[in-house]
């Protein structure tokens, strides 16, 4: 890695989403929304298994925590930090697992009739994306 790439443009010691979750947790807002464990109060067994630290910050998307579909604050900042860390122009956080991430990647890069080089053992999410966009595997 070149010396140039080891210097980050942004402060990589930040954790914007975690910091926002901690600020929200300290507000002690009473949950009337999903998830049903109500930050552990509604399911003591789950809290015992995962720990209060985990369930205490497992909350639904709300304004202080930004919105993954249209990030404008802490999620956008986290994406910018990730892009900076990887030396990329952009980075996008995903919550749908590998399948939605792979499909998003293929659907972004390919359109009907495009050829895409793929190995025989691709994940089925790639095949699904090919069906959706009409690209041709070669």
Can you name each region flagged by the protein language model?
Residues 52-100:
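Conserved N-terminal alpha-helix of the aminotransferase class I/II PLP-enzyme fold
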Residues 133-134:
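Short, structured coil segments at secondary-structure junctions
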Residues 104:
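N-terminal active-site wall of soluble small-molecule enzyme domains
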Residues 98-101, 123-125:
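Short acidic loop-to-helix transition motifs that present clustered carboxylates
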Residues 1-73:
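N-terminal "arm"/small-domain region of PLP-dependent enzymes with the aminotransferase-like
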Residues 109-130:
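Conserved PLP-anchoring active-site segment centered on the Schiff-base-forming lysine
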Residues 84-85, 107-110:
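Glycine-rich helix-loop-beta junction characteristic of Rossmann-like nucleotide cofactor-binding loops
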């Amino acid at each position: 890695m070149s010396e140039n790439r080891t210097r980050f443009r942004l402060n990589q010691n930040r954790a914007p989403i975690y910091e926002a979750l901690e600020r929200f947790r300290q507000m002690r807002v009473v949950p009337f929304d999903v998830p049903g464990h109500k930050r552990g109060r509604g399911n003591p067994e789950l809290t015992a298994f995962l720990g209060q630290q985990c369930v205490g910050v497992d909350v639904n998307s709300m304004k202080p925590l930004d919105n993954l579909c249209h990030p404008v604050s802490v999620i956008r900042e986290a994406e910018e930090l990730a892009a900076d860390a990887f030396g990329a122009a952009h980075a996008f956080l995903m919550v749908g697992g590998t399948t939605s991430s792979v499909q998003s990647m293929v659907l972004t890069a390919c359109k009907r009739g495009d050829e895409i080089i793929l190995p025989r053992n691709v994940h089925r999410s790639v095949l699904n994306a090919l069906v959706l966009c009409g690209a041709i595997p070669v």
